[in-house]
């Protein structure tokens, strides 16, 4: 598997002329044909599978209708006047996406909807900007990863920008299990591709700073599969929890705040309350320190129907919650509560309280406890996270700190080379680099470290505007350095 993907990425990097390379990367035609099968033919259904084709068509139609519902669920944020257009495709001559030819909607047998999908009644918002033409001369292709349905690659556009490409993984479990069951590769591709299309629609409809940006998409005929779909999105770094536990509390708090803002947006989205059925960290990425959801094919908008509260049990591995059944026959707030508890068990409990400023711990503990008990909704949770941000950013969390009586000599436009020591958590693995609100906090930190004899205030700031400071064991090697200020502990 790895050998195959490495070869794919190498070919991808060499040219990526869409008419040929996308065929190799994303189409089953890149696989050797079976004995007695022409390279462009689809696998024929085995004995007894004719009835199975009807089941496959039913599943395709079900996913197609889901995509249509999300597409016409009202204008997304910032949407202008709705325009008639093919679902997620701009009209010929439009300002954004370009196709090498007009789209052809094909009607498969057995009652399945055509592919690509037919037009919806309205636009999901301003169209993405990139299309097939943007991918003609990409470079530096790298395989990022794959899941049940999709494979993700990292490429660099001719202008230098790095983006992510998503497509149905022809070696993946989703497509493979479908082909084994129904023996219809094209139909199974359409079934899997509707999940990618659903994600594309939701990325457009749910646009938000903590939702991955959709830059564009491309439909391309491939060997044996017409109109294979590739989406072009913002590129992020995978969420590695072990690495995050070694970062500063300030950066970990930013991730939790990002998540709180995302959940608030999902609870009040233009489509209604959206729940993420798969909430594992791998469904998110980090972009410049901000957490963003990237995988939306398992998102659900509809609340759970019920006839009584007995139907409204929210189940998790460690515990269950009982929610009320509304008079309208829906479990009240189940989508919101599911998101919130998953945020608690996957993120808040690990990232929020540890190594936080002592004066903020009571507030942070209350956030963790309340989300773990589902005592708060997303509105109150976000309000408390924003309060913690205000206290931290304004320096009010320092109101109970006592200023040190130690005196420090100020040496402007200077720095100390070497003489480092390690502390945790630090922004620098080889030294002690921490953020401080002001000079008084820097002195307090130095006084609390037995080995600290000096510190250097840099000209760098964190996302909250706090200064980054190097703490040192001495000042034997003070050198000129414009923009930095060294403070050394006075003798005595």
Curated annotation (Swiss-Prot):
Pfam families per UniProt: PIP49_C
TM annotation in the entry: none
Location of the active site: 278 (proton acceptor)
Disrupted gene: phenotype observed: Morphological defects at birth including growth retardation, short limbs, cleft palate, sternal dysraphia, shortened intestine and cyanosis. Long bones display reduced mineralization due to delayed chondrocyte differentiation. Neonates breathe abnormally, do not suckle and die within a day after birth, probably due to insufficient respiration as a result of the cleft palate.
Subcellular location: Secreted; Golgi apparatus
Sequence ranges of Low complexity compositional bias: 37-47
Signal peptide as annotated in the record: 1-32
Name of the coding gene: Pkdcc
InterPro entries in alphabetical order: FAM69_kinase_dom, Kinase-like_dom_sf, PKDCC, Prot_kinase_dom
Catalytic activity: L-tyrosyl-[protein] + ATP = O-phospho-L-tyrosyl-[protein] + ADP + H(+)
Protein task: Secreted tyrosine-protein kinase that mediates phosphorylation of extracellular proteins and endogenous proteins in the secretory pathway, which is essential for patterning at organogenesis stages. Mediates phosphorylation of MMP1, MMP13, MMP14, MMP19 and ERP29. May also have serine/threonine protein kinase activity. Required for longitudinal bone growth through regulation of chondrocyte differentiation. May be indirectly involved in protein transport from the Golgi apparatus to the plasma membrane.
Modified residues annotated as Phosphoserine in this record: 177
Modification Phosphotyrosine, positions: 148
Descriptive protein name: Extracellular tyrosine-protein kinase PKDCC
Outcome of swapping residue 148 to F: Does not affect kinase activity nor secretion to the extracellular medium
UniProt feature, compositional bias: Pro residues: 110-127
Binding site for ATP: 144-152, 166
A single Gene Ontology CC term: Golgi apparatus
Stretches with biased composition (Basic and acidic residues): 52-69
Induction field: Down-regulated by hedgehog (Hh) signaling.
Post-translational modification remark: Phosphorylated on tyrosines; probably via autophosphorylation.
């Amino acid at each position: 598997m790895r050998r195959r993907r490495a070869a794919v990425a190498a070919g991808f990097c060499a040219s990526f002329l869409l008419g040929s390379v996308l065929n190799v990367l994303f189409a089953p035609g890149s696989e050797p044909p079976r004995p007695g099968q022409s390279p462009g033919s689809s696998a024929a259904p085995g004995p007894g599978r004719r009835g199975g084709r009807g089941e496959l068509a039913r599943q395709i139609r079900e996913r197609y209708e889901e995509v249509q519902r999300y597409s016409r669920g009202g204008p997304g944020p910032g949407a202008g006047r709705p325009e008639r257009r093919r679902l997620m495709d701009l009209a010929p001559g439009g300002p954004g996406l370009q196709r090498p030819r007009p789209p052809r909607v094909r009607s498969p047998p057995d009652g399945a909807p055509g592919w690509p999908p037919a037009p919806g009644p309205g636009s999901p918002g301003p169209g993405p900007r990139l299309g097939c033409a943007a991918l003609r001369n990409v470079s530096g292709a790298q395989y990022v990863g794959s899941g049940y349905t999709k494979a993700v690659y990292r490429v660099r556009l001719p202008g230098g920008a790095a983006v992510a490409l998503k497509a149905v993984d022809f070696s993946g479990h989703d497509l493979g299990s479908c082909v084994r069951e129904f023996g219809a590769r094209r139909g199974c591709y359409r079934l899997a591709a509707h999940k990618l299309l659903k994600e594309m629609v939701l990325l457009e409809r749910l646009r938000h700073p903590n939702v991955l940006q959709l830059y564009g998409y491309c439909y391309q005929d491939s060997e044996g599969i017409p109109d294979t779909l590739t989406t072009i999105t913002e590129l992020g770094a995978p969420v590695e929890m072990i690495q995050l536990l070694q970062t500063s509390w300030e950066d970990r708090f930013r991730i939790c705040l990002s998540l709180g803002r995302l959940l608030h947006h999902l609870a009040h989205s233009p489509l209604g309350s959206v729940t993420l059925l798969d909430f594992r960290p791998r469904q998110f990425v980090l972009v410049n320190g901000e957490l963003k959801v990237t995988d939306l094919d398992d998102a659900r908008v509809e609340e759970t129907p019920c006839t009584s509260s007995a139907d409204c049990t929210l189940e998790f591995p460690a515990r269950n919650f009982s929610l009320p059944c509304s008079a309208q026959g829906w479990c009240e707030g189940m989508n919101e509560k599911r998101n919130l508890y998953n945020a608690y068990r996957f993120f808040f409990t690990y990232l929020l309280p540890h190594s936080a400023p002592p004066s903020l711990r009571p507030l942070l503990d209350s956030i963790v406890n309340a989300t773990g008990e589902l005592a708060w909704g997303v509105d109150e949770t976000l309000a408390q996270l924003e309060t913690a941000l205000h206290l931290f950013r304004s320096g009010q969390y320092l109101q109970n700190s006592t200023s040190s009586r130690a005196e420090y000599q100020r040496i402007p436009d200077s720095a100390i080379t070497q003489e480092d020591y390690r502390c945790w958590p630090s922004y620098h693995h080889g030294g002690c680099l921490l953020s401080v609100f002001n000079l008084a906090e820097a002195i307090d930190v130095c006084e609390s470290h037995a080995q600290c004899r000096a510190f250097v205030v840099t000209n760098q700031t964190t996302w909250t505007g706090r200064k980054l400071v190097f703490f040192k064991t001495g000042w034997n090697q003070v050198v000129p350095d414009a923009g930095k200020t060294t403070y050394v502990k006075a003798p005595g």
